[in-house]
Amino acid sequence: MPSYFEGKWAAAVLVIGDEILSGRTQDTNTNTIARFLGSLGIDLKEARVVGDVETEIVAALNALRAGYDLSLIHI
C-alpha cells in the first residue's frame, strides 16, 4: 500500500485507563493501531499509558503533541 504522506511521519498513542495500569484489562489495541499506521507509512514511536486522572491525561497529551506529528488517544 502506498504512503499518503510526504516524508516519514512519527506518531504516538496515549492509552487511558486505570484498568490498563492495574492489569485488570490488557491493551490489545495498540498493536492494531501500530500496524494500521505502518500501512500508511507512519511510524508509531511511543505508546504511553496514564490513569483516569484529568491532569495526567492533559500533561501526557500535551507532551506527545509537542513531540510527534500525530497523537492518538485510545480510551
What is each PLM-predicted segment?
Residues 2-3:
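N-terminal, positively charged, Ser/Thr/Ala/Gly-biased leader segments
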Residues 8-40, 46-47:
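Glycine-rich phosphate/diphosphate-binding loop of Rossmann-like nucleotide-binding domains
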Residues 74-75:
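Conserved small/polar residues in nucleotide/adenosyl-binding loops
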Residues 46-56:
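Short beta->alpha junction loops
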Residues 71:
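Receiver (REC) domain switch-region micro-motif
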Residues 68:
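An anion/phosphate-binding loop that grips the pyrophosphate of nucleotide cofactors and donors
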